[in-house]
Design a protein with these regions (language model features):
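Conserved beta-strand/loop scaffold segments within soluble protein domains that form the structured core
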Residues: 1-185, 189-192, 206-208, 213-226
Length: 226
């Protein structure tokens, strides 16, 4: 396992290079909760035949925060999963870019990305699946959900598929929604304060993507106090 804690108070660029040999496996858990400064975090990963990689990414927006996850399948029968949960508080920004480059046969990628934006927060997600002509038998799935919880939020989502082979299984989807005012009204009518209601809804929305070995600390940092 690789546990990565990215907490940079000032402006910073953090680069992580991972090269996985044949039939290797890695669970990569990353927490990045600093909300001040401008940050750029890049992860490059190259997977040889039979390698298996899982990333559990937990992140809060900062003055400007961009994360790039670049996965290159250089060997057949390799698998990569990117599971990410993010929150953006007032006047904070988060930009997550994920590229899965399938250049060899029978490779598999799964992206599951969930973001919650609070008042005046801004979040962007761009997920790209690229399958080359000779990469037959690939399976690539992308699911992205974003929730606006407050006024004046900005949410951008752009899932992309670029496929040059017919013998593949691929799907991608992105949904953007606002917090259900009916739910809020019901909860407040039962004596639950608005701040606590927002916390409950946020925790329910991010339940599936706060995962992996650092999930306990991620929950305490990403979910607002009740």
């Amino acid at each position: 396992e690789l546990h990565e804690f990215v907490d940079c108070e000032n402006n910073a660029a953090v680069m992580t290079w991972i090269k996985m040999g044949e039939n290797s496996s890695l669970i990569h858990a990353r927490n990045s909760f600093q909300e001040t400064g401008k940050h750029w975090q890049v992860t490059f990963n190259e997977l040889e035949s039979g390698a298996s990689y899982t990333m559990h990414n937990h992140v809060k927006g900062s003055e400007t925060k961009r994360q790039d996850v670049l996965i290159n399948f250089t060997g057949s029968d390799s698998t990569a999963r990117v599971i990410s949960a993010g929150t953006v508080n007032k006047d904070r920004k988060l930009d997550l870019q994920v590229i899965c480059d399938h250049s060899t046969p029978r490779t598999t990628s799964h992206q599951r990305i969930d973001h919650v934006a609070f008042e005046n927060g801004s979040t962007t997600f761009n997920g790209r699946i690229h399958i080359l002509e000779h990469a037959s038998g690939c399976n690539a799935q992308l699911k992205n959900r974003s929730l606006a919880m407050g006024s004046e939020t900005t949410i951008n989502a752009k899932p992309e598929l670029e496929i040059y082979n017919d013998d593949v299984q691929c799907s991608h989807g992105s949904t953007i929604g606002q917090v259900d005012e009916t739910q809020l009204f019901y909860m407040r009518s039962r004596g639950i304060k608005q701040k606590e209601a927002h916390s409950i809804l946020c925790e329910g929305f991010l339940r599936e993507t706060i995962s992996g070995p650092l999930s306990a600390s991620a929950t305490s940092n990403l979910i607002p106090e009740r």
